Amino acid sequence: MQLNEAVSARLKELLRERNMTQYQLYMKSGVPKSSIGNIVNCAYDSVKLRVILEICQGLEINISEFFNSPYFDETNLEP
């Protein structure tokens, strides 16, 4: 799995757990809805850490909670 795919999968999982839409996340985080959509759809090769931090603030989690997922285990990520 590529890193952008892991970020996408984790974001989808967190949105689903919170019954939150991309629009609601945009309203809470300030990250443009188009950017959130591009992250979810793996349209970006990479995502700035600052954007992930803003998303985490909108999700009301800290950044370590975002990355605390099997998606980010070394064995699951391609080099």
Predicted feature residues:
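A short, Lys/Arg-rich alpha-helix, primarily the initiator
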Residues: M1-T21
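The alpha-helix within a helix-turn-helix
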Residues: L15, Y26, C56
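Residue-level detection of the helix-turn-helix DNA-binding "recognition helix"
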Residues: R16, G30, N41, Y71
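Short alpha-helical DNA-recognition segment
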Residues: N19-N38
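Short, charged recognition helix plus adjacent turn
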Residues: N38, F67-P79
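Short, basic-rich loop-to-helix N-cap that marks the start of a DNA-contacting helix
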Residues: A43-E54
